[in-house]
Each structure stands twice: as structure tokens, then as C-alpha cells.
């Protein structure tokens, strides 16, 4: 029996609990009042759509600048926040997630084409949730909430009500350990090809 199986047997004898996304954290939107995105002389730095879409974990280096009205009225990002694409040309590219694992500077904002969730500490490890949000099971449930004809977007109320597994923290941490190892090995093998 694997360590993960032992933890599940010990800590979840009646099965893993499921909760709606809105129950496990605070959902927030990207910046508003943008007057000039990609402005070298902007008044704020932000995490852009491509950064979230392309990476399992956000790259916090060399972030672009934007100019926005009322920068003090914006949701400021923190380490542990999970970011999602809110719209795309295809349904499969909506709600692609990425987590901020690295220490992030104060005052960094979120692109207006993204939204995020801040997982409450009592519900666990943001990296676990990010791996789940990238899973095939979750992607299938997300696709049922996507709307559109030529441009597709995620329905926020439907997204917030999606049920996700919330195992105890030791189970989450073991899952993250396994998946981080797998991700690292995959990257090494890919680099050697």
C-alpha cells in the first residue's frame, strides 16, 4: 500500500469530502480601469494572460506594467493565489489555472482577462488545488460551464458552484509531492530529448 493510500485510509475512512469552489476560497476578478496595458511607464505591475495560460506555476519575474485609474481600489495578488483564464477562442482554453508559488512583490495586480481564487488556509494547499484544476476530470466539468459562439467565456456562478475534492491537508501534501516529482521528471526527460 502506498503512502497516499495509507493516508486516505487513515484520514478519510468515509471518503473524501467535496465542496463547491466558492466554499474553499475567495474568487476575485482582474484589474479594472485600465487605460494603457503594456505601458513601460505604468503605475502598476500585473500578471498577464499568457503567463497564466503557459505555466503551471506563475513566473513572477519581469512582469509587465499597466496604467490604471485608482490603483488603490484593486485586488492585490499574494503567494498562493490561483489564477484562471476567463475567456478564449476555444472552450478548452477557458479556466486554465496557474498558481503563484514563488514569493511575490507587494502591489502586483491581475490582468483584466483573468480571475483568481485565494484558497482559505483551513482548506489547504493551493498547489494541490491547482493540480486538480488542471486535471482531466475538472476540465470536463469546466467545459460544461463555458458559454459562447465565437469567443468563449466561463460562467462565474457556474464555476463557483463546481464541486471539488477537499481531502485533509496531509493527503493534499502527499499528492503535491507525487505530482511535483512527476512534473520535475517529465521536464528532465523532455529536456534530454
Placement of each model-derived feature along the sequence:
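Amphipathic alpha-helical segments
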Residues: 15-19, 129, 160-191
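Short, hydrophobic/aromatic alpha-helical segments in well-folded domains
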Residues: 7, 113, 178-181
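A generic secondary-structure signal for well-formed alpha-helical elements
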Residues: 28, 87, 91, 183-186, ...
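Accessory (non-catalytic) regions of SAM-dependent nucleic-acid methyltransferases
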Residues: 1-11, 82
Amino acid at each position: 500500500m502506498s503512502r497516499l493510500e495509507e493516508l486516505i485510509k487513515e484520514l478519510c475512512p468515509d471518503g473524501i469530502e467535496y465542496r463547491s469552489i466558492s466554499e474553499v476560497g475567495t474568487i476575485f476578478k482582474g484589474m479594472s480601469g485600465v487605460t494603457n496595458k503594456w505601458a513601460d511607464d505604468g503605475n502598476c505591475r500585473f500578471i498577464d494572460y499568457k503567463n497564466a495560460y503557459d505555466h503551471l506555476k506563475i513566473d513572477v519575474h519581469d512582469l509587465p506594467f499597466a496604467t490604471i485609474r485608482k490603483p488603490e481600489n484593486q485586488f492585490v495578488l499574494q503567494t498562493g493565489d490561483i489564477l484562471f483564464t476567463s475567456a478564449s477562442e476555444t472552450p478548452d482554453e477557458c479556466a486554465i489555472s496557474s498558481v503563484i508559488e514563488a514569493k511575490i512583490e507587494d502591489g502586483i495586480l491581475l490582468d483584466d482577462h483573468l480571475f483568481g481564487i485565494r484558497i482559505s488556509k483551513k482548506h489547504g494547499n493551493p498547489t494541490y488545488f491547482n493540480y486538480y484544476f488542471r486535471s482531466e476530470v475538472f476540465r470536463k466539468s469546466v467545459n460544461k460551464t463555458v458559454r459562447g459562439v465565437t469567443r468563449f467565456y466561463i460562467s462565474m456562478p457556474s464555476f463557483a458552484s463546481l464541486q471539488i475534492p477537499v481531502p485533509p491537508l496531509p493527503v493534499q501534501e502527499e499528492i503535491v509531492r507525487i505530482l511535483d516529482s512527476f512534473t520535475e521528471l517529465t521536464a528532465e526527460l523532455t529536456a534530454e530529448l
